[in-house]
């Protein structure tokens, strides 16, 4: 515990907007009932009064354009049980004021592969957006065959809940037609088939190629080798004029990842300690049950005490599950989300790099044209000035009997055409780089806002879980004391 006491969290700043106008609270849809209340804690705010509760709701509606899109993932259910095609489906409940929805409240069941399809389509159609990532499918539960266990499905439900919540908070992605169809369509399989056909016709790689979570900067597909070659070459090329804005964003993102990884280790240790205490409490209750046979005269008191200890252990298990499955998972999901933003920053840097390289190529072509126009590439001493390449080319042309003046004019004409083409390409690359940079700046603002809302929800859920646990513990032991007083047991002062 000494290690935990020495942990320093002073380098983390959590921003919360204070809103003094609490009377200007905006109506918002809340989940009054749910088949799995535990999942709802990680969902939208429950409207508890607080210093910034009304302000957060007001900001949320302003940032999202005034339309409500509230999604809850719950009730993991194993379908086709007992067959080789078994899978887990999740209940998605949506409350919305979007006019494109047929009903204000819809419920559908979706499996994980449906989420994967939605994610890939969003990555393909919104390449300038930081599409929130899905929970990693490559986990040991698939190797051990425990992917249908309650612990695994609960963790995944929490992560899918956060995935939809981030989409619902994003000012652009929340308006995507594919998202609305995912949340409402009764024939989702037909939607996937039609989208798959259109995606395969639109790009050579189809939907499956866009798996970078919004970091793919260019449309079309040049093949895996071209992508690898570009990445390899760009690894040794640096931007000549880096934008200070994005350098600071990258530094803040790295610092966020470092802090989240540190907190994750601490929370994981806390969850393990809670599991140890739960096990100890169960052992204690079991040992007191054994005392009944040895001391039958105190059977009532011992049995009530053991039952109270078991209730405390059950409450602690519930708290541990929330800490481990929901809050700890939210830290890991936020690290993955931050990685998506970094990929988007890399894509912006790549566009700037493309623009700078095209500019250099254009300047070099203009220099070559000017040298040809001044006749410096030919003559007795000019061949040495043009370098070994020009010298060798001149000698080869002499051997072949080529007219140097005609060759110079041909090369000059080709350079003029190349310069004209490069000028257009440079202008296109400049406009694309600037527009993409502006979009990335807006994405960073959206990421910061979504992060702030998500942290508030997760902290509220964690606080609620602790309040519920300690309130239940207090009630359990107060009830035990009352029962003992009725039995006439004299309690120590």
From Swiss-Prot:
Alphabetized UniProt keyword annotations: Autophagy, Coiled coil, Cytoplasm, Endosome, Lipid-binding, Membrane, Protein transport, Transport
Coiled-coil stretches noted in the UniProt entry, renumbered to this chain: 248-292, 338-363, 405-442
Gene3D superfamilies: Arfaptin homology (AH) domain/BAR domain (1.20.1270.60), Phox-like domain (3.30.1520.10)
Major location (coarse): cytoplasm
Top-level lineage group: Eukaryota
Cysteine disulfide links: none
Transmembrane segment boundaries: none
InterPro entries: AH/BAR_dom_sf (IPR027267), BAR_dom (IPR004148), PX_dom (IPR001683), PX_dom_sf (IPR036871)
Pfam families: BAR (PF03114), PX (PF00787)
Subcellular location: Cytoplasm; Membrane; Endosome membrane
Record protein name field: Sorting nexin-4
């Amino acid at each position: 515990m000494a290690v935990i006491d020495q942990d320093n969290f002073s380098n983390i700043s959590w921003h919360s907007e204070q809103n003094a106008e609490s009377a200007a609270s905006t109506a918002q849809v809340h989940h009054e009932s749910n088949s799995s209340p535990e999942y709802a804690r990680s969902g939208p705010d429950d409207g508890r009064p607080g210093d910034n509760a009304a302000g957060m709701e007001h900001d949320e509606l302003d940032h999202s354009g005034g339309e409500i899109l509230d999604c809850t993932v719950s009730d993991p259910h194993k379908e086709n049980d007992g067959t080789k095609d078994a899978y887990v489906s999740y209940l998605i409940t949506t409350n919305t004021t979007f006019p494109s929805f047929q009903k204000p409240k819809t419920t559908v069941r979706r499996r994980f592969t449906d989420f994967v399809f939605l994610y890939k389509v969003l990555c393909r159609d919104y390449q300038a957006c930081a599409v929130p990532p899905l929970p990693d499918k490559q986990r040991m539960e698939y190797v051990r065959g425990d992917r249908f266990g309650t612990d695994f499905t609960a963790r995944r439900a929490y992560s899918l809940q956060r995935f939809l919540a981030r989409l619902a908070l994003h000012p652009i992605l929340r308006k995507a037609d594919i998202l609305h169809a995912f949340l409402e369509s009764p024939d989702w399989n037909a939607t996937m088939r039609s989208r798959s056909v259109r995606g395969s016709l639109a790009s050579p790689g189809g939907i499956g190629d866009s798996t970078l979570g919004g970091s793919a900067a260019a449309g079309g597909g040049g093949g895996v080798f071209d992508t690898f070659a570009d990445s390899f070459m760009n690894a040794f090329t640096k931007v000549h004029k880096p934008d200070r804005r994005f350098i600071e964003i990258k530094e803040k993102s790295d610092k966020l990842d470092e802090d989240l990884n540190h907190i994750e280790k601490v929370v994981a240790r806390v969850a393990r300690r809670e599991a140890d205490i739960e096990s100890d409490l169960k052992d204690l209750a079991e040992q007191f049950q054994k005392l009944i046979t040895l001391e039958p005269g105190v059977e009532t008191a011992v049995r009530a005490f053991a039952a109270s200890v078991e209730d405390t252990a059950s409450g602690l298990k519930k708290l541990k599950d929330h800490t481990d499955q929901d809050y700890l998972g939210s830290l890991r999901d936020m690290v993955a989300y931050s990685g998506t933003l970094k990929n988007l920053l890399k894509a912006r840097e790549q566009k700037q790099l493309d623009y700078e390289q095209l500019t250099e190529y254009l300047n070099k072509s203009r220099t070559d044209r000017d040298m040809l126009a001044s006749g410096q590439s030919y003559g007795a001493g000019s061949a040495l000035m043009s370098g070994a390449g020009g010298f060798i080319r001149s000698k080869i042309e002499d051997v072949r009997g080529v007219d140097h003046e005609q060759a110079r004019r041909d090369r000059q004409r080709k350079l003029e055409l190349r310069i004209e083409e490069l000028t257009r390409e440079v202008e296109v690359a400049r406009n694309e780089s600037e527009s993409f940079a502006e979009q990335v700046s807006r994405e960073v603002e959206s990421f910061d806002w979504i992060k702030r809302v998500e942290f508030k929800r997760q902290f509220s859920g964690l606080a609620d879980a602790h309040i519920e646990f300690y309130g239940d513990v207090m009630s359990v032991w107060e009830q035990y004391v009352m029962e003992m007083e009725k039995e006439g047991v004299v309690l120590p002062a």
